[in-house]
UniProtKB/Swiss-Prot annotation:
GO terms for molecular function: DNA binding. The keyword DNA-binding applies. It is found in: Virion. It comes from the Viruses. Keywords: DNA-binding, Late protein, Virion. The keyword DNA-binding applies. Coiled coil: none annotated. It comes from Canine adenovirus serotype 1 (strain CLL). GO terms for cellular component: viral nucleocapsid. This is Late L2 mu core protein. InterPro entries: Adenovirus_late_L2_mu_core. Its main location: virion. Belongs to the adenoviridae pX family.
Length: 68
C-alpha cells in the first residue's frame, strides 16, 4: 500500500455563537436528565449501535487493503 493515502472524514458540529437561549437549553437538559436510570446497559446501547454502524466502513478498508 505504498504511495496510497487513506483519508477519513469526520463531521463535527461546531457552534460559533452561543446565545443565552442556547445556554439555557443546555442547563434544562442536564436538570431533566438527572441521574442515569436503567443501570449500565442503556449506556452501552449507543456504543454498540455506533460499532455496528462502523463495521461496513472498517470492512471496506480491510478489503481494499487486501486487494492492493
Amino acid at each position: 500500500m505504498a504511495g496510497r493515502n487513506v483519508t477519513l472524514r469526520l463531521r463535527v458540529p461546531v457552534r460559533t455563537k452561543i446565545t443565552g437561549a442556547g445556554r439555557r437549553r443546555g442547563r434544562r437538559t442536564r436538570i431533566r436528565c438527572g441521574r442515569m436510570k436503567g443501570g449500565f446497559l442503556p449506556a452501552l446501547i449507543p456504543l454498540i449501535a455506533a460499532a455496528i454502524g462502523a463495521v461496513p466502513g472498517i470492512a471496506s478498508v480491510a478489503l481494499q487493503a487486501a486487494r492492493h
